[in-house]
UniProtKB/Swiss-Prot annotation:
Keywords: Amidation, Cleavage on pair of basic residues, Hormone, Phosphoprotein, Secreted, Signal. Residues 1-28 form the signal peptide. InterPro entries: Pancreatic_hormone-like (IPR001955), Pancreatic_hormone-like_CS (IPR020392). The keyword Hydrolase does not apply. Residues 68-97 form a propeptide. This is Peptide YY. The gene is PYY. Transmembrane segments: none annotated. This gut peptide inhibits exocrine pancreatic secretion, has a vasoconstrictory action and inhibitis jejunal and colonic mobility. One of its GO terms (molecular function) is neuropeptide Y receptor binding. It comes from Bos taurus (Bovine). Its main location: secreted. Coiled coil: none annotated. It is found in: Secreted.
Length: 97
């Protein structure tokens, strides 16, 4: 019975720490710009579109790593001896069954 009482404060501490960490991650993500009203001036629209373009560039920026390989580079890595790897729809030769 005592082990149940001791684990409760530890569990509460872990949950609070997790909430603080998640709060920090939310603050790191850029906020979407607020759209101006229907009767906005051209200057306000220009500022909005500039900030929207900046926001979209941040959110959709290219990440380097696994997805950076092009198909040509991947085929060179997979088939270093051949220029064009042959495409076979089924294996040639005698069937095993």
């Amino acid at each position: 019975m005592m082990s149940g009482r001791r684990s409760w404060p530890a569990m509460a501490t872990v949950l609070l720490t997790l909430l603080v960490c998640l709060g920090e991650l939310v603050d790191a993500y850029p906020a979407k710009p607020q759209a101006p009203g229907e009767h906005a001036s051209p200057d306000e629209l220009n500022r909005y579109y500039t900030s929207l373009r900046h926001y979209l560039n941040l959110v959709t920026r290219q990440r380097f790593g696994k997805r950076d390989f092009s198909e040509a580079l991947l085929s060179i890595l997979l088939f270093p001896d051949r220029e064009d790897p042959p495409v076979k729809s089924r294996p040639e030769g005698a069937y095993l069954w």
